[in-house]
């Protein structure tokens, strides 16, 4: 799947068209009010572009939370409509459902240039294709009803725009089932695709991937795929201990050890050698006597090892220096996973040093792309989003792209 040849909203003629946009308005709500409108803000450029370019109506659809195929009022998108009205400075027509004759009629009757927000897609089991029942058992949707649901959604628009990168790895009805002739990315999805194409299809070299995370076995596909693309790999986080113990018999105390992952280590090291990829591992650690913000802590080296009863919770000063050097040598940097338990201040320094190095690299002309999830949280904690080239909005979606998988929501977009 090429990421760089998909239709974008700017390739579409929108005049007089009903523009059906899949957005990601999955926002935190407290007492009926949106507590963080970041995702709503992020969709505004696409919505405004459609309005400014002659769309007859803009119809927005989204999920919120996990209502498991039932209409549950606390998961209603109604509070989002109020927030969106404030941000757009124009009325938003909120509909009580997302499909059905009443909804089709309401969309047709909405005034010219209207913004219409449909109710939560996941109030219907047909959006995800399955749900959990009261006993927590998975139940599947009736395939004929899924087809009907998709056809009903399709009837609401003339052109389809997907601006929900965070769910692009899910083959949900609103992502893959809307068979309008022209299906394009919105600005958010386009930015994601442009940056990931830059890294995965045509990187400026040297190309460095920084990987963290707890288990080798969780990241094995990611590591394998990266070894075919990068010049250098930095491995931090809990999974570094599985490598160190397996390869060099370093004492790791009570640090994370991933037995199934350890069986993959030799193959990874062999492949790196064959592909001429340098792997940079930590050589010292900040260890704690318990997994706790208030743990006693000290620095140990590979030679000393992690004492019994202690665990490695961050990388140490020598490792910070090695990681920084690797970052400053690279021209394209992909960062997925912090090197330590950044939530605890005593074990957050490795993440901050790495962040500072990536910011410095950008200032020197490198491209830095941050995969979503924990790494994006590190960046946000230090208000550094604007200082890096791109911080992905999709944790799961960006991980699957980096693993070399096809994203269903992207594959469904029309080619140029």
From Swiss-Prot:
Name its co-factor(s): Mg(2+)
Identify the residues that bind ATP: 214, 219, 238, 312, 343, 374-375
List ligand-binding residues for AMP: 214-215, 219, 238, 312, 343
Q: Which GO terms describe its biological process?
A: gluconeogenesis; glycolytic process
Instruction: Name the gene.
Output: pgkA
Q: Give the binding site residues for (2R)-3-phosphoglycerate.
A: 23-26, 39, 62-63, 65-66, 121-122, 169-170
**Function statement:** Catalyzes one of the two ATP producing reactions in the glycolytic pathway via the reversible conversion of 1,3-diphosphoglycerate to 3-phosphoglycerate. Both L- and D- forms of purine and pyrimidine nucleotides can be used as substrates, but the activity is much lower on pyrimidines. Negatively regulates the biosynthesis of acetyl-CoA from pyruvate in the mitochondrion.
* Reaction catalysis annotation: (2R)-3-phosphoglycerate + ATP = (2R)-3-phospho-glyceroyl phosphate + ADP
> For Mg(2+), which residues are the binding ones?
214, 218, 374
Where do the annotations place ADP binding?
Answer: 213, 237, 342
The molecule here is called Phosphoglycerate kinase
Q: Does the keyword Kinase apply?
A: yes
- Where does it localize? Cytoplasm; Mitochondrion
Keywords attached to this Swiss-Prot or TrEMBL record, sorted alphabetically, are: ATP-binding, Cytoplasm, Glycolysis, Kinase, Magnesium, Metal-binding, Mitochondrion, Nucleotide-binding, Transferase
What's any one GO cellular component for it?
Answer: mitochondrion
């Amino acid at each position: 799947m090429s990421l760089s040849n998909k239709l974008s909203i700017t390739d579409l003629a929108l005049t007089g068209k009903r523009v059906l946009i899949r957005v990601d308005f999955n926002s935190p709500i407290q007492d009926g009010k949106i507590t963080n409108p970041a995702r709503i803000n992020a969709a505004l450029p696409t919505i405004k572009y459609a309005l400014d370019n002659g769309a007859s109506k803009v119809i927005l659809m989204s999920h919120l939370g996990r209502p498991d195929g039932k209409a549950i009022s606390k998961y209603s998108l109604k509070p989002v409509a109020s927030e969106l009205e404030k941000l757009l400075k124009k009325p938003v027509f909120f509909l009580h459902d997302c499909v059905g004759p009443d909804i089709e009629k309401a969309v047709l009757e909405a005034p010219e240039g209207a913004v219409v927000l449909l109710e939560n897609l996941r109030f219907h089991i047909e959006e995800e294709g399955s749900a959990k029942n009261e006993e927590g058992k998975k139940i599947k949707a009736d395939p004929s009803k899924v087809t009907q649901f998709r056809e009903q959604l399709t009837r609401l628009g003339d052109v389809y725009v997907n601006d929900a990168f965070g769910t692009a790895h899910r083959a949900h009805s609103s992502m893959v089932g809307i068979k309008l002739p022209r299906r394009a990315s919105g600005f958010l999805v386009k930015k994601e695709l442009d940056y990931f194409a830059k890294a995965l299809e045509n990187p400026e070299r040297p190309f460095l991937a920084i990987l963290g995370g707890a288990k080798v076995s969780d990241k094995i596909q990611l590591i394998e795929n990266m070894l075919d693309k990068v010049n250098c790999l930095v491995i931090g986080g809990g999974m570094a201990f599985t490598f160190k113990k397996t390869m060099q018999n370093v004492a790791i105390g009570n640090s994370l050890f991933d037995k199934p992952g350890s069986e993959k280590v030799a193959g990874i090291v062999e492949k790196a050698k064959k592909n001429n990829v340098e792997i940079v591992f930590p050589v010292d650690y900040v260890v704690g006597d318990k997994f706790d913000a208030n743990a006693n802590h000290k620095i140990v080296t590979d030679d000393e090892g992690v004492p019994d009863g202690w665990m490695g919770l961050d990388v140490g000063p020598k490792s910070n220096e090695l990681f920084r050097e690797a970052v400053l040598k690279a021209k394209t940097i992909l960062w997925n996973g912090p090197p330590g338990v950044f939530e605890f201040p005593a074990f957050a320094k490795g993440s901050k040093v790495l962040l500072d190095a990536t910011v410095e690299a950008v200032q020197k002309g490198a491209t830095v792309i941050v995969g979503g999830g924990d790494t994006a949280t590190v960046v946000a904690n230090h208000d550094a989003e604007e200082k890096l080239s791109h911080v992905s909005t999709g944790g799961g979606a960006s991980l699957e792209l980096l693993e070399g998988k096809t994203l269903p929501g992207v594959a469904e977009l029309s080619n140029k």
